[in-house]
Regions:
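Conserved active-site "lid/cap" helical segment
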Residues: 1-74, 78-81, 165-177, 187, ...
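N-terminal extracellular/periplasmic Venus flytrap/periplasmic-binding protein-like
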Residues: 11-12, 23-27, 31-32, 40, ...
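Flexible glycine-/small-residue-enriched beta->alpha junction loops
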Residues: 110-168
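Active-site pocket-lining segment
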Residues: 167, 203, 213, 282-353
Length: 401
């Protein structure tokens, strides 16, 4: 089992594609959070051991070690190291898990971990020519999905886009369009309810952005992606992305910009400083599944993580499954024997509502779950994400009282 504690966390608002945060570099987005947490946590910066951030793209401004760039941009000491991890959509959660493992092994007492992604600023990329005077050039938009796919893997596993994998899961598990749209509408409604209750005020750090050519700025304080008007009737009018498919722009997560970071440490450092943690990290798990059915990865990861934590699913008070696509979450729930109307499932809405900046989402889920447990006064939460190329990652946390 793991033995690490979540003491604090922040995230930026999640911006829509080409929206308010599109003018901000990903290392600067993460740096804002690192600086604020270092300043306000109550712990000494000298106690920090490392900064670990997840990032999925790493093809542009987020290349050459996002974490190190972000901590330097934040003004943290140069003696503090930083490393960047990539497990695609679960990169942010994997960063938190790596920090928790290090703390549990006694390799440092305090870590900053999370992730960032600016999908708006993802560059176009192309390979160098393999031969002289080549006339073959292929340009990829690195925002999402595969580029430079290995032909041997394509032959073996196919090269389905992420939405196509959502449709694959829908067909395999009998998820129809109405089911998917109902889940999407529920995600929007749950997000709006949490917003109106002020839940997100405790986790969002507003971001100042450029607003004009004359040096004007404005403060971005709220997520841009949610669509409160997206009821079942509105969702039903949207076309499927692929003929005969279930996935639409309305029942899928967005293309977004954002960052999320949590502060983790051992129990003793909190006791020394008189700071009470939000939650204890108990266990984690990562699994592999067929790439064309990548969306079902959370189900196996959740069960394995719960087994390692020594608890049953019915003991869990809050279940966060990242909403890459509605059919994918519904299939996981079906395999787990759960109903999407179960109040434990994504009670504050999910990525269909607030968006999915790939490298940040895992850390966002950890932060939301830790705060959510405090709100509902339940003991355990489980957090999970599906991962492109066929993986699932999960973490189990326990509320600190």
């Amino acid at each position: 089992m793991l033995d690490a504690y979540i003491y604090a966390g922040l995230r930026t608002p999640f911006g829509r594609h080409a929206g308010a945060l599109s003018t901000v570099r990903p290392d600067d987005l993460a740096g804002l959070l690192l600086a604020r947490l270092a300043e306000t946590s109550g712990f000494a910066v000298d106690d920090l051991e490392d900064v670990i951030l997840g990032c999925t793209n790493q093809a542009g401004e987020d290349s050459r070690n996002l974490a190190r760039n972000a901590l330097l941009a934040a003004g943290l000491p140069a003696r503090l190291p930083g490393q960047t991890v990539n497990r695609l959509c679960a990169s942010g959660l994997s960063a938190v898990i790596d920090a928790a493992r290090a703390i549990s092994c006694g390799e440092g007492r305090l870590y900053l971990a999370g992730g960032a992604e600016s999908m708006s600023r993802a560059p176009f990329v192309m390979a160098k020519a393999e031969s002289a005077f080549s006339r073959t050039l292929e340009v990829f938009d690195s925002t999402i999905g595969a580029r430079f796919a290995n032909p041997r893997l394509v032959e073996r596993y196919g090269n389905d886009s992420m939405p196509e994998t959502g449709d694959n899961v829908a067909r395999a598990f009998g998820i129809d369009r109405e089911d998917a749209d109902r889940f999407a509408a529920s995600s929007q409604a749950r997000y709006q309810a949490a917003l109106e209750e002020g839940f997100f005020l405790g986790e969002i750090l507003p971001v100042e952005v450029r607003a004009g050519r004359k040096g004007e700025t404005r403060l971005v304080e709220r997520d841009e992606h949610p669509r409160p008007q997206a009821d079942l009737a509105a969702l039903a009018r949207l076309p499927a992305l692929f003929a005969g498919g279930v996935v639409t722009a309305g029942n899928a997560s967005g293309i977004n910009d954002g960052a999320a970071v949590v502060l983790l440490g051992d129990r003793a450092i909190g006791e020394r400083e008189g700071i009470r943690p939000l939650a204890r990290i108990l266990a984690s798990a990562s699994v592999g599944v067929e790439p064309r059915l990548m969306g079902i990865g959370p189900q196996q990861a959740i069960l394995r993580a719960l087994q390692r934590a020594g608890i049953d699913l019915d003991e869990v008070g809050l279940i966060e499954i990242n909403e890459a696509f509605a059919p994918q979450v519904l299939a996981c729930l079906k395999l787990l024997g759960l109903d999407y109307e179960d109040p434990r499932i994504n009670p504050h809405g999910g990525a269909i509502a607030l968006g999915h900046p790939l490298g940040a989402s895992g850390a966002r889920l950890v932060l939301t779950a830790a705060r959510g447990l405090q709100r509902i006064e339940r003991r355990y939460a489980v957090i999970s994400l599906c991962v492109g190329l066929g993986q699932g990652v999960a973490m189990v946390i326990e509320r600190c009282r």
